[in-house]
Amino acid sequence: MCFAEHVRNTPDGKLDFLGVFDYMDVPEFPAYPANFNFVMQFVKNVAVGRTEHKIHVSIIGDNDERLIEEESTFFMANGNPDRPSKVSLLWQNENIVFPKPFVYSFKIRVDDGVSLMRTHQLPVMLRQS
């Protein structure tokens, strides 16, 4: 998973990243980041299995407060060990609010946790002058 200020798909199928980060320093709370994106890449190196997958993304704050809960579907071709199938999912959000300094958890579940379950951390802190 990668966090960035700006991400765009290029005509040749690549992703351009600008402002990649692994923590956020904000001037005040609540924090309203103007541009907040994260990218996940999935790789499949087997020739069998599902091609349609459901993804569930949760952003969790203090006391298990859910800032975001979103579900979507993505499709992924079957691959093989010599040439794996890859898909990159770009999630852009302009409406997220971080209410206070905290290490927020991004929980990713694919196919109800059967195919994949991961948690990533993002510290959001008050900028020190």
Where are these regions (language model features)?
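Contiguous segments within soluble domain cores/interaction surfaces
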Residues: M1-K100, S105-V110, V114-S129
